[in-house]
UniProtKB/Swiss-Prot annotation:
Keyword Transmembrane helix: no
GO MF term list: argininosuccinate synthase activity; ATP binding
Protein name (record): Argininosuccinate synthase
GO terms under biological process: argininosuccinate metabolic process; L-arginine biosynthetic process; urea cycle
Record's subcellular location: Cytoplasm
Amino acid sequence: MSDVKKVVLAYSGGLDTSVIAKWLQEEYNCEVVTFTADLGQGEEVEPARAKAQALGIKEIYIEDLREEFVRDFVFPMFRANTIYEGEYLLGTSIARPLIAKRLIEIANETGADAISHGATGKGNDQVRFELGAYALKPGVKVIAPWREWDLTSRETLMAYCEEHKIPVDFSTKKKKSPYSMDANLLHISFEGDQLEDPWTEPEDDMWRWSVSPENAPNEPTYIEIGYEKGDPVSINGEAMSPATILETLNKVGGANGIGRVDIVENRFVGMKARGCYETPGGTIMMKAHRAIESITLDREAAHLKDEMMPRYAKLIYNGFWWSEERRMMQALIDTSQKYVNGTVRLKLYKGNVTVVGRQSDNSLFDSKIATFEDDAGAYDQKDAAGFIKLNALRMRIAAQKGRGFLDNDK
């Protein structure tokens, strides 16, 4: 283990990563650099500095990455209308590439020869962190303590703290929630405890960001989201930064009971796992983006995007953000967004997001052609006869050759 001289640790300041920091110092006899990212998780990150200093750490990075997170990771993903297995908006998955990127950048800045993370050996995050790290710095060494040590429970972690005099305050010792949680500006997730039984309904006090739809206001809330090149740029006519837009949508969505999902997903490592997620702002953005695309995207371009989306979602879920194929797909997706400009009006009511209006200077919707009234010759209905005959030709030939579908067909 002596080949490692300096390691950059993804550090939250909590129990697990505080133990990891000390463990790295003891087991690898190396210098530890800590990196703490503010991705909008709703907790103060600055206390991580004092905790790291108490462990004798001299190089401490604490960074506000909220704008970069939303601008360069969340928004590009939403341009593709990305959703995994029909329900998961990838709130955890999309945060890992940014953390991996900064770990490697800091390693380069500080001359570190390794990085470390606190992901367990059972989950997807270990894969996401490490695939990203190897893509960005092929020769980097990755230390994953949960795959090496024998500290397998909270009790053993606490015992390690006491043995090595690791300063962990009372609020860290006290387990505030029975669930394993992860949060950033896009979502908050819950796993473990009673959720490990997929038949058990979550207790209502588990949810943090949203009221239950039953307790949401009895009057709807209307909002308008402005789009430029596929990205939201304003709410109710007020221009906002990417992070502010998502923060605002989280608040208004949560107040209206929007964004709760309870799913069993297929993890990349092979197991099924249940997770509950609150993604109020993301749920609104997904609905709004599809609405503005519905009037600005050509039919075949829209259908091609829909065909690509599950593959794109799987790439992100499995940790391949920094892959050539994701970059290729992103280029195609971004090209499709050139004319995705305009405004969407939505009604938020008791857990539901309903599109009630959409408009764009780049709209392909032509009321003169689509009207059920007299179109003044804009659309010649007689043209449909030839169109139908040509599209039916292959099926007519098959039927004539005996490939019918009725019981009496031979």
